[in-house]
Amino acid sequence: DLTKEDKFNYAFGIKNGDYKFRRDNREFSVDKENGCINPSLLSIKNFSTKIAELLYSLKDSQYETFTDLLEVLRNEGLAESRIQELIKMNYFSEFGSIKYLEKLTEVFSWFFKNKKYLTQFKKDTVYELGIDFDIFRRNCGSETAKNFMKINPKGIISEIMKEYENLETTEMEVIRYRHDVLGYLDIIDKKYAGYCFVTDLNSEYSPKLKLYALANGNEIPVKIDKKTFKNQPLKRGDIIKVLKQDKKPKTKKVDGKWVKLEEKEWWITEYQKY
């Protein structure tokens, strides 16, 4: 759900900022340059003042690649799990898409252990990871029957990642990733008119859903008839576009019979799942 602050900002036309590398996310702050209020990393579970201060201290540093930044962050003691959560929040978007950076972080972890790069690598491990031996041969000083010696990890990482340069993340995936980290949604954007995020679901009778409307931040209770739901089942965390809906009278069981009430409720009759 949106916080009171988010609703206030939206009502008065104050733009919500975002969690972004090089921005001040140490606490809620007015960002005059971008005309918005930036959120605080401290509002995210497991993020401390120390982490927020570290990230902000790097705002003016230049990094040729995300690998260089990863090296700094790991040497400063930032846990890989926190880095992964920041990636999911699109915090490091200047370096590439979420999926690309997730893959790069995985590859980086193969070569960076205990705050330093490996200098040799077992051939068995290269084979298990499915990496072309020629990549290692181009980036090592020598090799034995079992190991590649004096390796150039950054060169190897760079070559491996060429295969993933076009790895994109859809807008709907970005929204889902954000929810995974925050545990709620704070997105309000009119370009998402008709798009909803399933926040709750009870399919015991006629399926009841709670939908978060991405265009305005409202949470809407709706129902779907069993046949429609069976043809296109949904679960919590799904994103749908509502194509058709209808307002029908609520029903209540009285003396063993279903009676229509004056109060009405929304039923979704057609939707597209993303």
Language model segments and positions:
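Noncatalytic, beta-rich nucleic-acid-contacting surfaces in large DNA/RNA-processing enzymes
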Residues: 1-274
